Amino acid sequence: RVFAPSEDKFEEVDTGNSERSLRYRRAYQVAKGAVGPQVGTVRRKLERVMMSQAQTFWEGGKRSGRLDVRRNSKKIVELRPDVFRRRQEESAVNTALSILVDMSGSMSSSKIFMAQRATIAICEALDGMRVPLEVLGHHTAASSAMQDAWYRLPQDRRKMVSRVQSIDMHLFKGFDEPLSMARAKLGRMTQMTDGANADGDAIVMAAKRLMARREPRKVMLVLSDGEPAYTGYNRNIHNHTRDCVKWVGENGIEIAGLGIMSASVTKYYDRVVVVNKIEDFATTYIDEVAKLLTGRSLST
């Protein structure tokens, strides 16, 4: 059957039984170890920037804390319990972050390992900073039956089909999911590359989830090794990808492309970082993430 939008799939990554889950957790730890030195440095830098922007205030009417004599002298005389105040800190980063990883066949081998490590570096650096973070991966589903059905269509009807393959969207970590619960799923990422990449449609799918968040600032990072590639007819897939990126921006999402050993992302995104080796994380990649989250460079 020729593709219909309802055939796109959204599924949480399955880590299987306890033995497989343990194996994926070990894979995560290996990847984390590869970026460990950078993660520690980046976390300290991010914390410094965020703390400098945080707003601190005192909230009264508490039953414990510091005695608020100035505002509650009458209540103190009356022996009321709500005469204390507590120091509250409002996070400087009221931002939700979505990371979308191209997991097509061309990303196999060293590229998906680098994408996994880049993703883990961000997850670990932001862990504990109260930044809602979602990690998604996408590729098309290979189906010879759908492809054959498309080719059997009359030429005029074939031109009406913009995309033959459906999209498989994998959830590695939810916005409100603790990182500790997602590590096994992220550890499996390197084993899941397949098919092609319908970047534009996948970006829109991820963006709609991000748009549902209540945080005033929304940021999306798209990790990819190249250009979109999938079967279709009535669509210029390159222009379509650019149109989707533009639509995301018009709907209040700041979007950036991270090129994995490729500069092709420069064709589709205004904000771009190209990473060719793991050592680039602590400079180019992480600094761009910091600027997106805080509006400031880590070097400031």
Task: Pin down the residues of each PLM region.
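Acidic, glycine-rich A-domain
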Residues: R1-T300
